[in-house]
């Protein structure tokens, strides 16, 4: 029986649960890997993506604190690639152990993934994504006026000033053929971590750019390009809900893309959390006839693959 190719987008709770130490994050990923191994055991070929918000934020603080002519701070796009390697390494080890415990073969492999964006994307005119450490107003203005120039800072809810960067839409994933080859040879692939490293293509040349790609949209684009059967977006809740946290709250179990578009117009989903997941779910479900997206929690992921849990999104 042909295995289903599934792109799984891990939420932040799958990696970091409050303690930012390496050991705590490794422990969180050990638990996450057991759930992923259950999915593999049920007959799925997995390509795993993940977020990196807390990790890249902490790394940028470290870069700032150690910045000097001898140890210069690395740019954001380089920090994204560094966190892809770090989280990928931890998850590879955890998955290999989880599969071994189940008597399963196969190995996990991490692909440092570049994601092409358009240089004329509207997001570059209006950077909105806050990243990295907080600064005083004086420090922020000094950095904006420095010879490094081009940096944009905004006040963040009275907590200080933070750098803001564009969040452009992913256009293509440069390594998608490599990822497919690894899957076809029986490997579990970890790719497009943190939304991927954003790059601009100019003929044969590729150059990184300081931006942050939404991880759910990157997962959606990856699922399209590798022709996945399903996109599974794992988050902190079991179902997508309308009237969330109200007495009239209702879980959505099977829903069409058109129904979800109606709920978006009603502003049912929060901007910074569920809305991008729902939009990515719609995009993948509508990309090709027969595509399906599932949004659920990590603990229900295996049941969701059987159609017994989570919010299942299908084309209208």
Curated annotation (Swiss-Prot):
The organism's place on the tree of life at top rank: Bacteria
Compartments, as annotated in UniProt: Cytoplasm
GO cellular component, one term: cytosol
Pathway linked to the protein: Metabolic intermediate metabolism; carbamoyl phosphate degradation; CO(2) and NH(3) from carbamoyl phosphate: step 1/1
Catalytic activity: hydrogencarbonate + NH4(+) + ATP = carbamoyl phosphate + ADP + H2O + H(+)
Enzyme Commission designation: 2.7.2.2
GO biological process: arginine deiminase pathway
Keyword list, A-Z: Arginine metabolism, ATP-binding, Cytoplasm, Kinase, Nucleotide-binding, Transferase
GO molecular function, one term: carbamate kinase activity
Family: Belongs to the carbamate kinase family.
NCBIfam families reported in the protein's UniProt record: arcC, PRK12352.1
Protein name per UniProt: Carbamate kinase
Gene (name only): arcC
């Amino acid at each position: 029986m042909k295995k289903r190719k599934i792109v799984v987008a891990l939420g932040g709770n799958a990696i970091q649960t409050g303690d930012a130490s390496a050991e705590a994050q490794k422990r969180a990923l050990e638990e996450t890997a057991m759930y992923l191994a259950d999915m593999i055991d049920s007959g799925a070929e997995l390509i795993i993506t993940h977020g990196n918000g807390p990790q890249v934020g902490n790394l940028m603080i470290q870069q700032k604190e150690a910045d000097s002519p001898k140890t210069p701070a690395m740019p954001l796009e380089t920090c994204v690639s560094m966190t892809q390697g770090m989280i990928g390494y931890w998850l590879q080890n955890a998955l290999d152990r989880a599969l071994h415990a189940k008597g399963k073969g196969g190995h996990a492999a991490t692909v440092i993934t570049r994601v092409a964006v358009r240089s004329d994307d509207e997001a570059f005119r209006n950077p909105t994504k806050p990243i990295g450490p907080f600064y005083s107003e004086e420090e922020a203005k000094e950095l904006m006026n420095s010879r490094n120039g081009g940096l944009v800072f905004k006040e963040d809810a009275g907590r200080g000033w933070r750098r803001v960067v564009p969040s452009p839409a992913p256009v293509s994933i440069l390594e998608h053929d490599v990822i497919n080859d690894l899957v076809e040879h029986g490997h579990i692939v970890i790719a497009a971590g943190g939304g991927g490293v954003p790059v601009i293509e100019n003929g044969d040349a590729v150059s990184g750019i300081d931006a942050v790609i939404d991880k759910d949209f990157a997962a959606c684009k990856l699922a399209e390009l590798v022709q996945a059967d399903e996109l599974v977006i794992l988050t902190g809740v079991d179902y997508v809900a309308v009237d969330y946290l109200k007495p009239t709250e209702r879980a959505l179990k099977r829903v069409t893309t058109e129904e979800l578009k109606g709920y978006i117009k009603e502003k049912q989903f929060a901007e910074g959390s569920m809305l991008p997941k729902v939009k990515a779910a719609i995009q993948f479900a509508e990309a090709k006839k027969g595509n399906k997206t599932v949004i659920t929690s990590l603990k229900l992921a295996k049941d969701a693959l059987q159609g017994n849990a989570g919010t299942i999104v299908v084309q209208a």
